[in-house]
Amino acid sequence: MSASESEIQARLLAQALPYMQRYENKTIVVKYGGHAMGNPELGRAFASDIALLKQSGVNPIVVHGGGPQIGAMLNKMGIESKFEGGLRVTDEKTVEIVEMVLAGSINKEIVALINQTGEWAIGLCGKDGNMVFAEKARKTIKDPDSNIERILDLGFVGEVVEVDRTLLDLLARSEMIPVIAPVAPGRDGHTYNINADTFAGAIAGALNATRLLFLTDVPGVLDKQGNLIKELSVAQAHALIADGTISGGMIPKVETCMEAIKAGVQGVVILNGKTAHSVLLEIFTERGAGTLIVP
């Protein structure tokens, strides 16, 4: 290693120290999804980031999605994917496959990646320890021609109605890193598939997490000139939605961030999961790596 490389590493470590102290014993929930999940190199970088958070005294919790993998498995089994208003319809046969892919295949892949770093990860879903209960999601869509709202029947797509933090509190006091799939039971005995973003927000809110990070395929919230906005208050976010700066698929993402803050999360970050080590850059550097939304 050259002298210049040593100096750069020393500066980075010096910059990280106060942030390590700030986040010691704090809970950070990371929603892992998007392009990063399909890239082995980015997957290994993500796992090492989570391991380093744990080694630095942080309590990291991973929540993951898996929409593309679910679609691929349904195609493989000859089951047509149905969508209503852009949302997957989950019938009884589909929800079994969703649970198999999310809580089985994907969850264990992430657990294995983190375990390969030398840390201990444990795979869970909302069913474990009665951690999460859900109910059937109530979604409506407005007809653009008649302006009349109609109710969407999405089958076994759910919304979180209750989070019991007992198991997560036990794990926080251990060496374990929870990796959670967004599948949960209802009081009616059915299994529900839950949007991973809202599931992560519910977990983070119940734990009063210091940070909730959403790893996406975009750098964060951009202004009208395409520049990254580093920080927004909830009021500013509402204003940017109203004036069209925040539009399209970013609107539900930002709305989920604001709901999480309302539930008790201290700050929510939208950042680019396609950037290697974006989690560490966000948490342990002054510049951060995405858009921070605060109360």
Swiss-Prot record:
GO CC annotations on file: cytoplasm
Cite the binding residues for substrate.
66-67, 88, 193
Q: Where is this site: Transition state stabilizer?
A: 31, 253
Localization, UniProt: Cytoplasm
User: Example GO biological process term?
Assistant: L-arginine biosynthetic process
Which Gene3D superfamilies does the UniProt entry name for this protein?
Acetylglutamate kinase-like (3.40.1160.10)
Its EC number is 2.7.2.8
The reaction(s) annotated as catalysed by this protein in its Swiss-Prot or TrEMBL entry are: N-acetyl-L-glutamate + ATP = N-acetyl-L-glutamyl 5-phosphate + ADP
The entry lists its GO molecular-function terms as: acetylglutamate kinase activity; ATP binding
Q: What is its main location?
A: cytoplasm
Q: Could you tell me which pathway this protein works in? A: Amino-acid biosynthesis; L-arginine biosynthesis; N(2)-acetyl-L-ornithine from L-glutamate: step 2/4
Key words, A-Z: Amino-acid biosynthesis, Arginine biosynthesis, ATP-binding, Cytoplasm, Kinase, Nucleotide-binding, Transferase
Instruction: Kindly give the Pfam families that the UniProt entry links to this protein.
Output: AA_kinase (PF00696)
InterPro entries xref list: AceGlu_kinase-like_sf, AcgluKinase_fam, ArgB, Asp/Glu/Uridylate_kinase, Glu/AcGlu_kinase, NAGK-C
Q: According to its UniProt record, which protein family does this protein belong to?
A: Belongs to the acetylglutamate kinase family. ArgB subfamily.
NCBIfam families per record: argB
Q: Per its database record, what is this protein's job?
A: Catalyzes the ATP-dependent phosphorylation of N-acetyl-L-glutamate.
Write down what this protein is called: Acetylglutamate kinase
Native source species: Sinorhizobium fredii (strain NBRC 101917 / NGR234)
